Amino acid sequence: MPSIGHRIVAQNAMLTGTVPPGSSSVIADLHPAYFAMVMATGIVSIAALLVGLHAVAVTLFPANVCFAFVLAALTILRIVRFPARVIADLSDHRRAVGFFTLVAATSVLGSQVLLITGLRSVATILWILAIVFWAALTYGVFTALTVTRSKPTLAEGINGGWLVAVVAPQSIVVLGVQLASGYGAYAEPVLFFCLAMWLGAGMLYIWIISLIFYRYTFFLLEPSDLAPP
């Protein structure tokens, strides 16, 4: 039975985002972009399937499912135990866009499920989840970055990782197009939705890549600036 003092320390840690002694700093410091592991593994698996390396694709699939479940569990645990850390990440220009890897990972995993197992129902659920995640994060992240009072300079705040905000909706498009043929009369609305998403993502790419080009061209560039955030 924890003492009153221990409970107070734990409550203060949740409110301030600090890690109390004995707690797992791994969970507290979990980077929002870690879902890139699921995204990357899924891409390699799908590529292997398309070039005829079926054994490689099938081997990577269960591994990727495990990665997804482990990261999802750690993320949920982090939200529950360290909500202040999560909120701080949402308004951090270097870390916030990492949340969009969740969208891309969900969509890529859905494509894996569809192409390797043929389970359209599971792939559809993952597609819907990806859309929900994308909508919530698009409004949540960019609103938080806009209204926060403490902002870095352009040189410090933007990096190549921001392009994952473009990859996220485009991954939804890829899975949506793969699923559209099975929706009968709803296929055309789904394809129209995918077209709109693709065009919107393309416009977002122009905005972001312009800022990245401007930052790399007109500001001092250090080797550390090319490292992951």
Language-model-derived ranges and their functions:
Residues A47-V58, V113-V122, G176-F192:
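Helix-coil boundary and interhelical linker segments in multi-pass alpha-helical membrane proteins
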Residues T59-A73, V122-A136, F192-Y205:
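Structural signature of hydrophobic alpha-helical transmembrane segments
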